[in-house]
């Protein structure tokens, strides 16, 4: 039972941290968003890239920036992303976004 509780706390922490950074991407200008999404594309797995391409198509967009903007517009980015991505894929995108964000504080780059 204790393990389940700890697992649940980890999921909540992951969702909170992922959502916070993804919300930052929602406020980026178009050029910055396109640049970061291209960087993310190069860092995520083929499966996650395929899921992103699927989201673009299902959202009737021509590119990932459009799809991301539409997910941001729902006012619940985490929930919108969960329609197209698994929790693991969302974490992968978050990790790549953090690495690609020129404004992020990269604590591991000492």
From Swiss-Prot:
Chief localization: secreted
One GO molecular-function annotation for this sequence?
iron ion binding
What's the superkingdom here?
Eukaryota
Cite the entry's keywords alphabetically: Antibiotic, Antimicrobial, Copper, Disulfide bond, Fungicide, Immunity, Innate immunity, Metal-binding, Secreted, Signal
Q: List the disulfide bonds.
A: 26-72, 39-100, 61-66
* Organs and tissues of expression: Expressed in the hemocytes, fat body and ovaries.
What task does this protein carry out? Has bacteriostatic activity against the Gram-positive bacterium M.luteus, but not against Gram-negative bacterium E.coli SBS363. Has fungistatic activity against C.neoformans, but not C.albicans. Binds and sequesters copper and iron ions. Copper-chelating is crucial for antimicrobial activity against M.luteus.
One GO biological-process annotation of the entry reads: killing of cells of another organism
Q: Which GO terms describe its cellular component?
A: extracellular region
What residue stretch is flagged as signal peptide? Answer: 1-20
Q: What is this protein called?
A: Antimicrobial peptide microplusin
């Amino acid at each position: 039972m204790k393990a389940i509780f700890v697992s649940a706390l980890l999921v909540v922490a992951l969702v909170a941290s992922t959502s916070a950074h993804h919300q930052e991407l929602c406020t980026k200008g178009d050029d910055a968003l396109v640049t970061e999404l291209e960087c993310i594309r190069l860092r995520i797995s083929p499966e996650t890239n395929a899921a992103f391409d699927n989201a673009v198509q299902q959202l009737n967009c021509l590119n990932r920036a459009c799809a991301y903007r539409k997910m941001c517009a729902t006012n619940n980015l985490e929930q919108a992303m969960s329609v197209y991505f698994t929790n693991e894929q969302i974490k992968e995108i978050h990790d790549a976004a953090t690495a690609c964000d020129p404004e992020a504080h990269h604590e591991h780059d000492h």
